[in-house]
Amino acid sequence: MAKPLTDSERQKQISVRGIAGLGDVAEVRKSFNRHLHFTLVKDRNVATPRDYFFALAHTVRDHLVGRWIRTQQHYYERDPKRIYYLSLEFYMGRTLQNTMVNLGLQTACDEATYQLGLDLEELEEIEEDAGLGNGGLGRLAACFLDSMATLGLAAYGYGIRYEFGIFNQKIVNGWQVEEADDWLRYGNPWEKARPEYMLPVHFYGRVEHTPNGVLWLDTQVVLAMPYDTPVPGYKNNTVNTMRLWSAKAPNDFKLKDFNVGDYIEAVLDRNLAENISRVLYPNDNFFEGKELRLKQEYFVVAATLQDIIRRFKSSKFGCRDPVRTCFETFPDKVAIQLNDTHPALSIPELMRILVDVEKVDWDKAWEITKKTCAYTNHTVLPEALERWPVSMFEKLLPRHLEIIYAINQRHLDHVAALFPGDVDRLRRMSVIEEGDCKRINMAHLCVIGSHAVNGVARIHSEIVKQSVFKDFYELEPEKFQNKTNGITPRRWLLLCNPGLAEIIVERIGEGFLTDLSQLKKLLSLVDDEAFIRDVAKVKQENKLKFSAQLEKEYKVKINPCSMFDVHVKRIHEYKRQLLNCLHIITLYNRIKKDPTKTFVPRTVMIGGKAAPGYHMAKMIIKLVTSIGDVVNHDPVVGDRLRVIFLENYRVSLAEKVIPAADLSQQISTAGTEASGTGNMKFMLNGALTIGTMDGANVEMAEEAGEENLFIFGMRVEDVEALDQKGYNAQEFYERLPELRQAVDQISSGFFSPKDPDCFKDVVNMLMYHDRFKVFADYEAYIQCQAQVDHLYRNPKDWTKKVIRNIACSGKFSSDRTITEYAREIWGVEPSDLQIPPP
């Protein structure tokens, strides 16, 4: 019998050092042809463009796997504290180009595909976006994964592998129509299924209290199948893992119910279990209390926590025996970050495992849970806060309900001891909201069960402390932090705007790509004629390229010398796309009134998806398209004003439009946008911002100087004062003739001649119940837009402001954000250690 291998011998066998790298062009070509032949089983006679994309994707993926295995081996050996980022959304976009960029493979692949008679850009366009997110929250998670890998943190993203991501948006007769996003139809070359790590997740059932502890019995079981996707850091040979769970019915599903005589019926019903990971809920900043959604939230939490504990218990590489049985050190080895309240069930689930399964006593378990978990709040809108009916929990997760009651009881006892007799405070701070329908406030559960709570921009974190969680802040002020959001400069500069990246590298080197604060060095070039020329030239090239794409995709001709005024984000009343509409109508009316006057030509682009059930958001889209129909076909206007609705806005479209934008619209009512990250992307890519003092705009103005942004409108204090006084929209309507004219045109059917009453709901809302006070900021907004026009007439001064903005955008790198999370919440240090290449 062969002698058992030592640890190091076994590692050498598993190690992938022997596989040759693909760095050079000949290697890439060889690998490409090999995959076309052996993986896709095609030759050049029958291969489709999609086959070529897959051959290239597999070629690039080959380059990842050695580093991926290496990284995981490295973590096994060092056994560092691991970071678990739990999110129901990861809005990843496309992977091919990002992987080539982070591995430094782009040049080789470009040359190899050229030699093969193929166009790299055309192949990149074939890839589907991984649209497993709605907007900012999911995209933030994706940027964070990129930064965690680049900073060498032992981090894992955990979420759901939705079969259908965010819907594809079609515009039909000016209305949004949703289509299913079947992004996996052709297969996903980046993921690796891991059936060997499949785990059971339990639902329903009943609870039994026995002398030996608590049992959760007679549950329905669904299996969670993990799919792993590599997350490469930027040129540091680190490749982390994003693990997404897919729901599978167990083999005996419904067949163990002896009364089911119908085998076929039982097999068909497997779909019911597997529906858990079928589709992403398309709500942004809105809570819809559906049982399937609660199942999704528990599904990801239950599977992930089992996985975390399995990894905690297994010690070094190759050893599958549980070694650590004491949970004392759990918070020293594990940090769990909750991306909003969606994974809040991590708190009661970890308690259930520690108390019921691992037999840790309650107080010890609670201490471990609190030290492990941290919670990020993403919104202050009351309609977005998760409040689940107790009755739903009773049925679906009976043991978790008991645990939540116990957590709440101890919490309220603690509060009562500190504030005797303050009954209203107890009501306000309870996890359970009393009323017709008792509800569980998930945000309160998160605050109580975490050692750190953070907002995502300074102003938002202040609102969190002074309003949303005021009572909790008074109880434990040391818990509350700010972590201003950021974006990855790899995707949002190097990948999407190579022209700009190149002229920056020529001046200051490439250190800024991993230390964005180095962009400050560009301040010395604000008056450098050559640099001003280069920046303007790159912008113009980006605009020409995007104009060509618009013409190809949407059959719309636009003037590439016009100002590109861009407003892209989810469609929501608080983001105030309606304020933009009023400006467009006002500009239109001014051109019509005085057609001989010279106007700065503008192309206004508005894009974003509306939640399918959000009536007002869908009406806003219809209004934009209707205004476009009138403006774009008016011969008096010509190409001085164009209104384009960008259909199906998504990550891959953002990568095209943002580098081409001149003006970035960030015009939410002050106090409503937690941070925003689109604002940062535009700033980094050389657009100027028109915006309110809200979210991260405040810090952008602080970094670049308020005079280098177009800031207008009410501040948070003004909004509060107006609330106190009572907002009266009619007052503004009566006082401002241009506003009145615009509103009257909307209500009279000027923009909807075939259906004059089309927009009566919109006008009624604006006039009588507008929570977001569009009219109150109208006058300031119009004046501010006039200043934009004025500066745009002087291209050199405009470009100087652009350079100042780019130079001051360094703070808004997600590398900075993640470094702060690491040091101040997770208790780990970023590492610039290069894992040796395979």
Curated annotation (Swiss-Prot):
PTM entry text: Phosphorylation of Ser-15 converts phosphorylase B (unphosphorylated) to phosphorylase A.
Site features described as Involved in the association of subunits, chain residue numbers: C109, C143
Domain of life of the source: Eukaryota
Residues modified as Phosphoserine: S15, S524
GO molecular function terms noted in the UniProt entry: carbohydrate binding; glycogen phosphorylase activity; identical protein binding; pyridoxal phosphate binding
UniProt-annotated site: Participates in a stacking interaction with the adenine ring of AMP, residues: Y76
Gene Ontology cellular component list: axon; cytoplasm
Enzyme class name: transferase
Family note: Belongs to the glycogen phosphorylase family.
Protein name according to UniProt: Glycogen phosphorylase, brain form
Organism: Rattus norvegicus
Gene from which this protein is expressed: Pygb
